[in-house]
């Protein structure tokens, strides 16, 4: 929020609030500041607080986070400790905002002890370490599974592709690496040193967290966090609270079977609520109040307390590499609640032998003493004076009348203490009165008074100053028996020094992160600069203009006789090739390394997801068994992924295996891999084809290819597959596709069958070539190349030792898409040596030309070049598109002569279910109902696009998805939709044609 350079209040005070000029100026500045605040609030992140909060709680949360977030207090539901829960959400978002983002994706962040379902619902790139330390943790995991299941059932379009990212391992045992971590009230069970050890295990350099805080914990045994309405209390080992109603036998059993009571505990109880309380070891909580640094395995971790407000402390821990010279680290803990109090010693019991110190307001003590002094008299019985003091302390009115004078009553005193407090005040007052009287009598009767009276005033002032300097604490000694001055803060001093003989092995640090970011930025800038010069540096032969229509089946002489790139003895690995002065070679090596890392990440993700499910079902790393509630746990996962299943040693599956599905691997205590029929193991969709590890390892075995890559970038239906058929020469070529569906289509078009030896030999997927033996070829023909990662294309060329790759695709249709949103993808786009464009379609009817041009003008940014802006059609069909509103899936016109497309898997599943209800053929259900992504490359006479939801779906706004959907047909296209969807690009453009 912008701050004004003027102080409005001072301006009014100096110029007068009634002056016309001053008033106008003040009004203008006030309006500007208000406008800035409103605009800032509109730009801020909207945070919806569903917990019902009273007025005071609402002010507290707005006071702490109202300036940062656009808070919406919806008052939807009554929740336990509502303010604490609402603050916890804001604390989580605040801590996440402390860390950098890469583009639109946030860097991977760890969460120690957090709620993984919160991150799942918001789509955060966060891995949660949520160990099951007891039954309470298992209860929370079960509750979160139910929450996940509910949101998936209610909104499958949004959550069907999300996978919760968490593990059930303690933070110190988890091996996920990340620079940043948050701990929202997760440090109570770990302590400061435990958090540091966990940070070291994860290679983390920066932690930000929150916890409940009260400085009085350092000297009191119990206290109260007023804003949070939370009472805390220390529980000493082997002792019992007076409120503890646990049966005696249970207490004895607990003492014999557990060691938790060997430590002093601290309990947090929320007042007027019967929810479960929080109990932690006091030594762990205390460490955040007293500790400052911790050295562990070559790293020094420093704790800094950032903000303490409304009973919540925000802190950060930063890992520091290198030798640390000696430095005095000092911090203070302030007790703001004590500034208005004084300690008063009172008797514990009636025998007046034992005494304790209680806190009492200074104003109460002062006013009570004043009343006591007014009523004090040697002739009055002490009991009468005692009654007067007790009357003041126990008064229910805001004012009391003593000797005809109105006085303010003090703070309410605990009923069990106020008698003793009154006695202590009486004794203290009497002692003061008598001591002062004796001092005056003694002073008045001595020669010192007469001596001082004879001195001049300057001399008296000088002697008084000398006495004060020599005797600064001159006061009645016995006063300390009743009053104790309470310090408003405590300090902790520590000398931090780390001196190692060897250099520290810094896994990751903030400096390293910054250095890498700078290097990446420079490298990207250099790549952009050299792209324009790449063609002139490495001259290549041009493809003739009639490539798409050429019927010459023999390879061109320039292809077979192309000179190879000069190789250097130093370029023996992909890593060294990335530093090659030949830009093209460095780009290809970088893309191959990225593709290998990406496939390895997919494999690790699959293992992590399976391991999480195995642990959630009660499995471990030693025994081949799961808990009895396995169906309850896997029900939720089965909704997200229908291929999630459990294989029992008897050969039985928990769910029926879908027809045509065969699992190649499974997961149990031995990890992922092929399993025997007599084993207990779990599976999911990643277990059907588990080839990521093999693809990652195979790619690293080859160097970047030096051959020429040519791209024919054609519009939909321009005859790319026809051109491949004409160019194919079995003596020198192999045809590569991105997926199995495309391979089957090309085999059918080329050989009129899909499973013959010739068809499977000459038309193969890129995965098949990398994973299996294959013959070397001179030329590779690639269909739908935009669906391939550039690194995989290079790996295929390198394995086949091809000198040329002729690639066909549409750069404006759906391209390669990462299945891991956290992976920083930079080199996936194909970088050809030469490009030819085809802008004539033979498939799409004439009215589709207008529809696509309309979509391009609406969806693409102004100034974006698109070949569809000038594309033309050779089709004789003039009118093909239509739109139809339907009430539900039962109203969709399903016929086996049409091809059906959906944007989402949920709509696809609904259509297939409806087709089964109508007893339609399995061939139609399996092969003629597809998603848009699965339909890329398909060509059909009659196509129907179906939308069954009106909930927000960004795919209907994306030009590339809408383009694929409306360009699959030759004769007719029908858009059947339920209701109206805001931003529906296809519906808007169909209405204009």
From Swiss-Prot:
GO terms for cellular component: host cell endoplasmic reticulum membrane; membrane. The keyword ATP-binding applies. GO terms for biological process: methylation; mRNA modification; RNA processing. Involved in the virus replication. Contains a helicase domain and a methyltransferase domain. The methyltransferase domain is probably involved in viral RNA capping. Involved in the formation of ER membrane spherular invaginations in which RNA replication complexes form. Residues 542-552 have a biased composition (Acidic residues). Residues 50-408 are annotated as: Methyltransferase. Interacts with RNA-directed RNA polymerase 2a. Its EC number is 3.6.4.-, 2.1.1.-. Residues 711-975 are annotated as: ATP-dependent helicase. Gene3D superfamilies: P-loop containing nucleotide triphosphate hydrolases. It is found in: Host endoplasmic reticulum membrane. It comes from Tomato aspermy virus. InterPro entries: (+)RNA_virus_helicase_core_dom (IPR027351), 1a_necrotic_phenotyp-det_dom (IPR021002), Alphavirus-like_MT_dom (IPR002588), CMV_1a_C (IPR022184), P-loop_NTPase (IPR027417). Keywords: ATP-binding, Helicase, Host endoplasmic reticulum, Host membrane, Hydrolase, Membrane, Methyltransferase, Nucleotide-binding, Transferase. Residues 564-576 have a biased composition (Low complexity). The lineage of its organism: Viruses, Riboviria, Orthornavirae, Kitrinoviricota, Alsuviricetes. Residues 553-562 have a biased composition (Basic and acidic residues). GO terms for molecular function: ATP binding; helicase activity; hydrolase activity, acting on acid anhydrides; mRNA methyltransferase activity; RNA binding. It comes from the Viruses. Residues 682-838 form the (+)RNA virus helicase ATP-binding domain. This is Replication protein 1a. It is a peripheral membrane protein.
């Amino acid at each position: 929020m912008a701050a004004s350079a003027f102080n409005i209040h001072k301006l009014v005070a100096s110029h007068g609030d009634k002056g016309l000029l001053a008033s106008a100026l003040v009004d203008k500045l006030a309006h500007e500041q208000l406008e800035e605040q409103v605009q800032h609030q509109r730009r801020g992140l909207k945070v919806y607080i569903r917990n019902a909060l009273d007025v005071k709680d609402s002010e507290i949360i707005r006071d702490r986070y109202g300036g940062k977030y656009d808070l919406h207090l919806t008052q939807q539901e009554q929740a336990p400790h509502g303010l604490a829960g609402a603050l916890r959400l804001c604390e989580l978002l605040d801590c996440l905002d402390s860390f950098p983002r890469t583009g639109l994706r946030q860097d991977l962040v760890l969460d120690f002890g957090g709620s993984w379902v919160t991150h799942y619902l918001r789509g955060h790139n966060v891995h949660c370490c949520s160990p099951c330390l007891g039954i309470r943790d298992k209860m929370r995991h079960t509750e979160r599974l139910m929450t996940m299941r509910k949101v998936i059932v209610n909104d499958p379009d949004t959550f069907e592709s999300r996978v919760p990212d968490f593990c059930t391992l303690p933070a110190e045992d988890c091996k996920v690496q990340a620079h940043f971590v948050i701990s929202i009230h997760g440090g109570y069970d770990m302590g400061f040193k435990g958090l540091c050890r966990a940070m070291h295990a994860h290679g983390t350099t920066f932690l930000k967290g929150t916890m409940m805080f009260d400085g009085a914990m350092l000297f009191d045994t119990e206290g109260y966090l007023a804003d949070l309405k939370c009472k805390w209390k220390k529980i000493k080992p082997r002792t019992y609270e007076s409120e503890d109603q646990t049966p005696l036998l249970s207490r004895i059993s607990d003492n014999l079977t557990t060691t938790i009571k060997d430590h002093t505990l601290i309990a947090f109880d929320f007042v007027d609520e019967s929810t479960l309380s929080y109990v932690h070891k006091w030594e762990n909580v205390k460490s955040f109040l007293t500790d400052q640094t911790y050295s562990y395995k070559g790293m020094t971790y420093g704790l800094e307390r950032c903000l303490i407000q409304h009973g919540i402390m925000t802190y950060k821990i930063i890992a520091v590499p290198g030798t640390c010279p000696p430095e005095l680290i000092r911090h203070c803990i302030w007790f703001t609640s004590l500034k208005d109090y004084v300690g008063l010693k009172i008797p514990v019991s009636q025998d007046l032998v034992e005494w304790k110190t209680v806190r009492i307001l200074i104003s109460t003590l002062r006013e009570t003493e004043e009343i006591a002094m007014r009523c004090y008299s040697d002739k009055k019985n002490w009991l009468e004076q005692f009654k007067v003091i007790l009357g003041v302390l126990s008064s229910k009115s805001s004012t009391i009348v003593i000797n005809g004078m109105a006085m303010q009553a003090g703070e309410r005193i605990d009923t069990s203490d106020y008698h003793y407090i009154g006695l202590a005040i009486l004794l203290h007052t009497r002692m003061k009165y008598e001591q002062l009287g004796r001092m005056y009598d003694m002073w008045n009767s001595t020669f010192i008074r007469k001596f001082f009276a004879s001195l001049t005033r300057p001399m008296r002032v000088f002697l008084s100053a000398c006495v004060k300097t020599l005797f600064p604490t001159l006061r009645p000694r016995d006063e300390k028996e009743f009053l104790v001055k309470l310090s408003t803060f405590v300090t902790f001093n520590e000398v931090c020094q780390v001196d190692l003989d060897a250099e520290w092995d810094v896994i990751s640090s903030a400096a390293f992160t910054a250095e890498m970011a700078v290097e990446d930025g420079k490298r990207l800038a250099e790549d952009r600069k050299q792209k324009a010069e790449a063609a002139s540096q490495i001259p290549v032969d041009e493809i003739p203009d009639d490539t798409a229509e050429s019927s010459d089946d023999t390879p061109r002489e320039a292809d077979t006789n192309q000179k190879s790139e000069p190789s250097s003895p130093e370029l023996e690995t992909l890593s060294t090739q990335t530093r090659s002065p030949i830009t093209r070679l460095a780009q290809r090596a970088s893309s191959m390394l990225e593709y290998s890392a990406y496939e390895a990440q997919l494999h690790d993700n699959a293992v992590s997801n399976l391991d999480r499910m195995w642990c959630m079902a009660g499995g471990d790393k030693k025994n081949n068994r799961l808990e009895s509630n396995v169906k309850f746990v896997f029900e939720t996962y089965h909704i997200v992924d229908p291929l999630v299943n459990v294989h029992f040693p008897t050969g039985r599956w928990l769910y029926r295996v879908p027809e045509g599905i065969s699992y190649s691997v499974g997961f149990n205590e031995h990890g992922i891999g092929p399993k025997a029929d007599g084993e207990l193991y779990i599976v999911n969709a990643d277990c059907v084809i588990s080839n990521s590890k093999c693809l990652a390892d195979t790619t690293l075995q080859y160097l970047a290819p030096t051959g020429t890559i040519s791209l024919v970038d054609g519009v939909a239906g321009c005859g790319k597959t026809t051109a491949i058929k004409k160019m194919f020469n079995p003596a020198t070529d192999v045809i590569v596709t991105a997926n199995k569906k495309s391979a089957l289509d090309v085999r059918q078009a080329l050989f009129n069958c899909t499973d013959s030896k010739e068809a499977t030999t000459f038309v193969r997927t890129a995965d098949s070539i990398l994973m299996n033996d294959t013959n070397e070829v001179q030329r590779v023909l690639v269909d739908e190349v935009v669906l391939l990662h550039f690194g995989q294309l290079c790996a295929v060329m390198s394995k086949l030792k091809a000198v040329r790759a002729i690639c066909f695709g549409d750069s404006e249709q759906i391209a390669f898409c990462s299945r891991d949103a956290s992976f920083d993808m930079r080199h996936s786009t194909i970088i050809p040596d030469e490009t030819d464009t085809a802008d004539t379609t033979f498939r799409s009817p004439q009215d589709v030309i207008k529809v696509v041009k309309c979509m391009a003008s609406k969806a693409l940014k102004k100034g974006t070049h698109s070949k569809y802006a000038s594309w033309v059609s050779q089709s004789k069909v003039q009118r093909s598109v239509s739109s139809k509103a339907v009430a539900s899936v039962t109203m969709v016109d399903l016929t086996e002569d049409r091809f059906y497309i959906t944007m989402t898997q949920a709509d696809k599943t609904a259509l297939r279910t409806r087709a089964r209800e109508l007893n339609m053929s399995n061939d139609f259900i399996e092969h003629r109902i597809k998603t848009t992504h699965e339909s890329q490359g398909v060509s059909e006479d009659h196509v129907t696009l179906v939308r069954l939801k009106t909930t927000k779906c960004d795919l209907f706004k994306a030009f590339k998805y809408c383009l694929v959907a409306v360009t699959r047909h030759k004769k007719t296209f029908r858009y059947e939709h339920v209701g109206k969807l805001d931003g529906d690009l296809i519906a808007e453009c169909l209405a204009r044609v």
